[in-house]
Design a protein with these regions (language model features):
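Accessory DNA-binding and partner-docking regions appended to nucleic-acid-acting proteins
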Residues: 1-13, 363-365, 394-608
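Flexible coil/turn residues that form the inter-helical turn or adjacent wing/linker of helix-turn-helix
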Residues: 173, 235, 378, 428, ...
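Helicase motor core with emphasis on the C-terminal RecA-like subdomain
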Residues: 3-7, 11-20, 24-28, 32-44, ...
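Short, charged low-complexity linear segments at domain edges
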Residues: 360-389
């Protein structure tokens, strides 16, 4: 591609961003991905929920011309994306089983004529022979695969229908592919590249950090009472509560309803029309809280979810990260609350042991152990989360329960040296439970058979409890001094960073283990910019009225972050309105007048 053409496409991309989507600047990583896609090269995009993944294929789709096909796993997610694109004046459509034959034929005709620019479709529909024949006759410019982690068996959400997508590369060798996901570790990334046949792709891994989400943990004592108090403190904010079973979902929703809280149950066992009604009410702010199994969420693009509660601990950090990521997609402050009981972990471990032995079970065990370590962390929870995804960071976040109410610190160098020495002396071949038994001088047959009762480190930690040493080793893992080798049954192994600690050359502070977890405590940190709260409330009311009249979710009109910016800047002209993030040319034409009129009346004091 000629240099002049590349520069022209880059300037067109910025124009599309500003005029169509109403954003003044690209977010970190977006511009590189978009430029690469426009050059015709494959991309793998790993970007957190709310990080702007969709724009990575939507912008090039509008610059390139032709048709971009987007593979998406859920009908609700497709419909939501299409609604938002149509509100921005983009010719988008979807094909799914809920449409009539006439509707489907109309969409197909739009694709054939070049009228449709973005087509959303489920993987199983895309892979039908007759559809692939149609596709071969359309002006296909790019294929985007959303939720791409679903193709990997090592991922936390493997879907067999995604596996068939691997055949597409042979049929479309010249078409650029873009795979997108919010959660993929290194193994899953390699799997996605291999299975989709991505050719020398740009692999763009953005920071996994969601700084606006506060990570909190509450140990379960009287869980339902604690949950009721927590929800009542949220004062009408939108939230999702995840439970591990359908019966618990229904029981929890019923108890919330009995307290006068606007809540509904959602799980795969409910009728389709019931699920659709719950989802629609939630999207439209007619329902405050959805209590759900993990069946709920992937299809949710609601930006103003202010809290996500895990009433039961998830099976892995990937699921936890993805589910908590449904909070605060608008970039405004949000909270992720995990209710934790060690007995829940024990139950999940028992369930896991009932599965067939093999590599998949080993990986699930490793992931479950990592989730347990997160729950029992004595150090900044965000650091534990980011280090799990391979994003080394050492500065505490200041926005989690540990940072806001820090555990007591002590000189942990001696304990660290004892633990590291024991790991080293047992040849870095054993897991945490065994290492702790050697440290505490346990008298069991396995230790005697291995001859480890003769080691100088045997029993050097007997004065401390089992829980104490588990906490110490977990902290050493979180600090990057120890790793768990999943290929060797999570054997503990020292990193290069452990050497100076082992030699006693550097100081090391550890957290005094909280054998009893931190009791719930009010930790309300004030948030929010310098905006007019009264005007914001009026703007929200107007938005809801327009959304109901147009039969669309309120955030499709403007999201909360856009309304806050309006309440901050009080734009009175079209030019001022276009400088607000989230207001593009099409939305200004469609919704601008009533919002500017309301702001004018508020500024003049005419609406009091």
């Amino acid at each position: 591609m000629a240099q002049a053409e590349v520069l022209n496409q880059e300037s067109l991309a910025k124009q599309v961003l500003q005029e169509t989507f109403g954003y003044q600047q690209f977010r970190p990583g977006q511009e590189t991905i978009i430029e690469t896609a426009l050059e015709g090269r494959d991309c793998l995009v790993v970007m957190p929920t709310g990080g702007g993944k969709s724009l990575c294929y939507q912008v090039p789709a509008l610059v390139m011309g032709g048709l971009t096909v987007v593979v998406s796993p859920l009908i609700s997610l497709m419909k939501d994306q299409v609604d938002q694109l149509l509100a921005n004046g983009v010719a988008a459509a979807c094909l799914n089983s809920t449409q009539s034959r006439e509707q489907q034929q109309e969409v197909m005709a739009g694709c054939r004529s070049g009228q449709v620019r973005l087509l959303y479709i489920a993987p199983e529909r895309l892979m039908l022979d007759n559809f692939l024949e149609h596709l071969a006759n359309w002006n296909l410019a790019m294929l985007a695969v959303d939720e791409a982690h679903c193709i990997s068996q090592w991922g936390h959400d493997f879907r067999p229908e995604y596996a068939a997508l691997g055949q597409l590369r042979q049929r479309m060798p010249q078409i650029p592919f873009m795979a997108l996901t919010a959660t993929a570790d290194d193994t899953s990334r390699r799997d996605i590249v291999r299975l989709l046949g991505l050719n020398d792709p740009l692999i763009q891994v953005s920071s996994f950090d969601r700084p606006n989400i506060r990570y909190m943990l509450m140990e379960k004592f009287k869980p339902l009472d604690q949950l009721m108090r927590y929800v009542q403190d949220q004062r009408g904010k939108s939230g999702i509560i995840y439970c591990n079973s359908r019966s618990k979902v229904e029981d929890t929703a019923a108890r919330l309803q009995s307290r006068g809280i606007s809540a509904a149950a959602y799980h795969a066992g409910l009728e389709n029309d019931v699920r659709a009604e719950v989802q629609e009410k939630f999207q439209r702010d007619d329902l405050q809280i959805v209590v759900a199994t993990v069946a709920f969420g992937m299809g949710i693009n609601k930006p103003n979810v202010r809290f996500v509660v895990h009433f039961d601990i998830p099976r892995n950090i990937e699921s936890y990260y993805q589910e908590t990521g449904r909070a605060g997609r608008d970039g405004l402050p949000a909270e992720a609350m995990l209710f934790y009981d060690p007995a829940d972990m024990a139950w999940l471990r028992r369930c896991l042991e009932e599965k067939p032995a093999g590599p998949l079970q080993d990986i699930e065990r490793h992931k479950l152990n990592a989730m347990g370590a997160f729950a029992e962390a004595q150090t900044c929870r965000r650091l534990v989360l980011l280090n799990y995804f391979g994003e080394g960071r050492q500065e505490p976040c200041g926005n989690c329960d540990i940072c806001l109410d820090p555990p007591k610190q002590y000189d942990g160098l001696m304990d660290a040296r004892k633990a590291l020495s024991t790991i080293y002396r047992v040849n870095q071949r054993f897991g945490m439970g065994y290492v702790v038994e050697v440290l505490r001088g346990a008298n069991n047959q396995r230790i005697r058979e291995m001859g480890h009762d003769k080691l100088p480190v045997y029993g050097i930690g007997r004065e401390q409890s089992h829980e104490h040493w588990v906490s110490v080793i977990r902290q050493l893992i979180h600090l990057g001094l120890v790793t768990q080798n999943i290929a060797q049954h999570s054997a503990l192994q020292l990193t290069e960073a452990a050497r100076p600690v082992l030699r006693g050359e550097v100081p090391l502070q550890l957290a005094v283990p909280r054998i009893v977890a931190l009791k719930p405590k009010a930790m309300q940190k004030s948030f929010g910019g310098n905006y007019d709260r009264k005007l914001f409330a009026k703007l929200r009311k107007l938005r809801k009225a327009i959304a109901d009249e147009e039969n669309i979710p309120p955030y499709v009109v403007f999201n909360d972050a856009t309304l806050i910016e309006m309440a901050e800047q009080s734009p009175l002209t079209a030019g001022e309105m276009l400088s607000v993030n989230g207001v593009g040319t099409r939305k200004l034409e469609r919704f601008g007048k009533p919002f500017m009129a309301l702001i004018r009346a508020h500024v003049d004091g005419d609406d009091e």
